[in-house]
């Protein structure tokens, strides 16, 4: 049984979150949690939270055994960007893009 959890509009760029997502794709859930715990990146905290939510969903909604779960799919899509302005010299301005991402984790007992 596949179970899904999402975090939409996570305040980190998709490029940075994908670095962490690639570390746990295809791993057993317990091993993935260990990897995320000791990964020194902000995105690791975000992905760990989504993974824990997917585990809880599998246990509560599907009655799955946590020891059998694997991270079958994990993907990170770009979310909407917030546009901000940074003042520059001589009355000019630069645009700053505060990027967001949508993190999706799918766990399965197969």
Curated annotation (Swiss-Prot):
UniProt record similarity statement: Belongs to the universal ribosomal protein uL22 family.
Described purpose of this protein according to its UniProt entry: This protein binds specifically to 23S rRNA; its binding is stimulated by other ribosomal proteins, e.g. L4, L17, and L20. It is important during the early stages of 50S assembly. It makes multiple contacts with different domains of the 23S rRNA in the assembled 50S subunit and ribosome. The globular domain of the protein is located near the polypeptide exit tunnel on the outside of the subunit, while an extended beta-hairpin is found that lines the wall of the exit tunnel in the center of the 70S ribosome.
PROSITE patterns with a match to the protein in the record: RIBOSOMAL_L22
Subunit structure: Part of the 50S ribosomal subunit.
PANTHER family per record: CHLOROPLAST 50S RIBOSOMAL PROTEIN L22-RELATED, LARGE RIBOSOMAL SUBUNIT PROTEIN UL22M
Cystines in this chain: none
Gene Ontology molecular function terms on file: rRNA binding; structural constituent of ribosome
Keyword field: Ribonucleoprotein, Ribosomal protein, RNA-binding, rRNA-binding
Domain of life, per lineage: Bacteria
GO cellular component, one term: cytosolic large ribosomal subunit
Protein name: Large ribosomal subunit protein uL22
GO biological process terms, semicolon-separated: translation
Gene behind this protein: rplV
Alphabetized Pfam families for the sequence: Ribosomal_L22
InterPro entries: Ribosomal_uL22, Ribosomal_uL22_bac/chlpt-type, Ribosomal_uL22_bac/org-type, Ribosomal_uL22_CS, Ribosomal_uL22_sf
């Amino acid at each position: 049984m596949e179970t899904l959890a999402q975090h939409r509009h996570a305040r980190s760029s998709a490029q940075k979150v994908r670095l962490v997502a690639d570390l746990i794709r295809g791993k057993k859930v317990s091993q993935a949690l260990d990897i995320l715990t000791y990964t020194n990146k902000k995105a690791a905290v975000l992905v760990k939270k989504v993974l824990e939510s997917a585990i809880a969903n599998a246990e509560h909604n599907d009655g799955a055994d946590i020891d059998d779960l694997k991270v079958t799919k994990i993907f990170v899509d770009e979310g909407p960007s917030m546009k901000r302005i940074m003042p520059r010299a001589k009355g000019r301005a630069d645009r700053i893009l505060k990027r967001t991402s949508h993190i999706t984790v799918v766990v399965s007992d197969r």
